[in-house]
Design a protein with these regions (language model features):
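C-terminal beta-strand-rich structural cap/linker in extracellular carbohydrate-active enzymes
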Residues: 589-608
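Loop/helix patches that line or flank the sugar-binding groove of alpha-linked glycan CAZymes
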Residues: 2, 17, 64, 80, ...
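N-terminal structural segment of carbohydrate-active enzymes
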Residues: 1-123, 131-142, 147-153, 157-160, ...
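Active-site region of glycoside hydrolase catalytic domains
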Residues: 123, 134-272, 321-324, 388-395, ...
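Active-site neighborhood of glycoside hydrolase catalytic domains
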Residues: 262, 267-336
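Hydrophobic faces of well-ordered beta-strands that scaffold small-molecule active sites
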Residues: 5-7, 54-56, 124-126, 298, ...
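Glycan-recognition surfaces
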Residues: 233, 320-411, 429-432, 460-484, ...
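The substrate-binding groove and active-site-proximal loops of carbohydrate-active enzymes
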Residues: 12-36, 86-107, 265-279, 295-305, ...
Length: 608
């Protein structure tokens, strides 16, 4: 098994060149990226960067408040943000029309993107969200019929809504109870404010485009009371409280008719039993539909909320027809890792609860170092404990420093500056053969500190709002100008330009990881245990290891400290025996290797 490198890209934001997007701005004001923006030069850049796969996030048609760009608005009371959550799927057999230049040809445009991706030598990963769908699944847009979509009965279309649970139902119901959404009172307040033409009100539920339309009418015709009422009446379905009777269970296992503000109230929970049902068959049909279109893999959302038996069945069935399709699981319970790989059949698992959490604790301790002792959970020794826990599962773990759920490394809430990430990057990328994932803009040091709307200033790049990101715009400019190769290869100091410094380091590291045999498929040897007493080595803040393949041996050292470190590292006799390394006058157990590592950084030394 060699080392996949996955680039997660969010097309809605990636291709958006709007210079000054408005907080909670509408699609009309803030714009959106398109399928076409992921053009051949972009894909050539990703291939040059060392990527093997592109995870296109936010492709499947989801609920949205917007009415432009070919969109049909869902009820705003349950939609999060102006654009809506990409994980509240409204139609599994469709793609978002706003991503297409011609919404009527949206599926053709996505198929063209798949073709461009394959032509660039890259593989396509798509989301599979098996646990939940939007509250209005199948009620807004029609299924697009095509090869593999036979039996496209809507989820829930034939459910018996008079019972709470039935093995034949796709959802859970609460007969005699109506849904009460957490923002119901605020929604009514917003409607009263809009009715009274209070345009100073902070609207966050009623769609921005509708508020803008009402404001424009009131400005142009301030005395036309009847006309204003008529305008509101046109949108009565969006301005009346959302009705759902019987209420349905909410996506995050909230089995209640009254979900809370922190629940996934924009979604409804799918009903899986421990054995085959019609729900299983419908979800298989969805996967097969996209596999037939050329999708090479699926990132499976919130796997632990769905019975493992379903995944074992569906993965086996899909792979019997499409053996090369890969399945990646978003999982968080480390004690289930072995089951999901060895029994269920996933190809890769998130190691968020393992290596990511370990590295984050180490980084945060050193970035915010106040001179206090290092607790065990903040120590670099945790890296050793994590790989020892994983054992033979290491190559199946998906390593990352960022994704859409986590805060950007450079945000105020994590590492504060992307240049503080290099030590962690070296471990996450170079430690073993495990796949690595990069989140779009990460290679530019994107900070995620915009206040976009539904997403506040939380250190994440929004997935709920129409938005444009400055660092990503500058990256796209580098790609369109073809300057990225020159910038990466240049030796001119760029310390005064943090973005270029980060880009140079990340691009070089990723390309090396993709091309070097020792990193792609080599053996790992952890040097920390034998260097606890070595001069300059701090087991809590330093991590050292070897990667070896055939005639090549590399030494890596990460320094998580905020201070430069010089250390004398020894390579034990056991390492020479284990890796089959030849000894020499300059390389032997008695000859310590002097290494100097800048603060929060990593170095690589070629030994053989």
């Amino acid at each position: 098994m060699e080392k996949p490198i996955i680039y997660q890209i969010f097309p809605r934001v990636w291709g958006n060149d709007t210079q000054k997007p408005l907080k909670r701005g509408s699609l009309e004001n803030n714009g959106t990226g398109k399928f076409r923006d992921i053009d051949s030069p972009t894909l050539e850049y990703l291939k040059w960067l060392g990527c093997s796969h592109v995870w296109y996030t936010g492709i499947l048609r989801h609920s949205t408040k917007s009415s432009g760009g070919g969109c049909l608005p869902s009820h705003p009371e349950f939609v999060k943000g102006e654009a809506g959550s990409p994980y509240a799927i409204e139609n599994y057999y469709d793609v978002n029309p706003y991503l297409a230049t011609d919404p009527d040809r949206r599926m053709e445009e996505f198929e063209d993107l798949i073709g461009r991706t394959h032509a660039a030598g890259l593989k396509v990963i798509l989301d599979f969200v098996p646990n939940h769908v939007s509250r209005d699944y199948g009620k807004v847009s029609p299924h697009l019929n095509g090869p593999g979509s036979s039996g496209t009965v809507y989820l829930g279309e034939k459910d018996d809504r008079t019972v709470h649970w039935s093995a034949e139902n796709d959802f859970f119901y609460y007969p005699g109870q109506s849904l009460v959404l957490p923002d119901a009172d605020e929604f009514r307040k917003e409607y009263r404010a809009l009715k009274n033409k209070d345009f100073g009100y902070d609207y966050r539920i009623i769609p921005a485009w509708l508020v803008d339309r009402c404001r424009a009418f009131a400005t142009d015709s301030p005395e036309d009371v009847r006309g204003y009422r008529s305008l509101l009446a046109q949108y009565d379905s969006l301005l009346s409280p959302y009705e759902e009777t019987p209420a349905m269970a909410t996506g995050n296992n909230c089995y209640s008719a009254i979900p809370g503000i922190n629940d996934w109230y924009e979604t409804v929970k799918l009903n899986y039993t421990d054995s085959y049902t019609g729900t299983w068959e419908k979800m298989y049909g969805i996967l097969r539909y996209w596999a037939l279109k050329g999708v090479d893999g699926f990132r499976c959302d919130m796997v632990e909320l769905v019975p493992a038996g379903f995944f074992k069945w569906v993965i086996g069935r899909i792979k019997s027809e499409f053996p090369e399709v890969v399945f990646i699981a978003e999982v968080y319970k480390k004690d289930l890792y072995r089951k999901y790989i060895r029994e269920v059949g996933f190809d890769y698992l998130y190691d968020k609860s393992g290596l990511y959490d370990t590295l984050r604790a180490i980084v945060e301790k050193n970035v915010n170092d106040n001179g206090m002792p290092v607790d065990l959970w903040q120590s670099a020794t945790g890296i050793t404990r994590n790989w020892q826990f994983l054992g033979d599962l290491q190559p199946y773990m998906l390593n990352f420093l960022e994704n859409h759920d986590e805060q950007r490394f450079a945000s105020d809430f994590f590492g504060k500056d992307a240049r503080n990430s290099f030590a962690a990057l070296y471990v996450s990328l170079f430690l073993n053969r495990a796949p690595f994932m990069l989140y779009y803009g990460e290679e530019m040091g994107e900070r995620g500190m915009d206040e976009e709307g539904f997403s506040g200033k939380d250190g994440r790049t929004t997935i709920f709002d129409w938005w444009s990101v400055g660092s990503v715009r500058r990256l796209r400019k580098m790609i369109s100008d073809g300057r990225y190769m020159e910038i990466a290869a240049s030796e001119t100091p760029v310390e005064e330009d943090a973005e270029l410094e980060v880009f140079r380091r990340y691009s070089r590291a990723l390309k090396f990881a993709a091309e070097d045999p020792a990193v792609r498929k080599g053996t790992v040897y952890d040097l920390c245990y034998c260097n606890f007493s070595s001069d300059g080595f701090d087991k809590n803040r330093h991590f050292a290891w070897l990667r070896d393949h055939e005639e090549e041996t590399l030494l890596f050292v990460s320094n998580f400290s905020s201070r430069e470190a010089t250390m004398e590292l020894m390579i034990p006799e056991h390492a020479f025996e284990w890796l089959g390394m030849p000894m020499s006058e300059d390389l032997n157990p008695q000859k310590h290797i002097r290494v100097t590592v800048p603060p929060m950084d990593g170095v690589m030394i070629r030994l053989l």
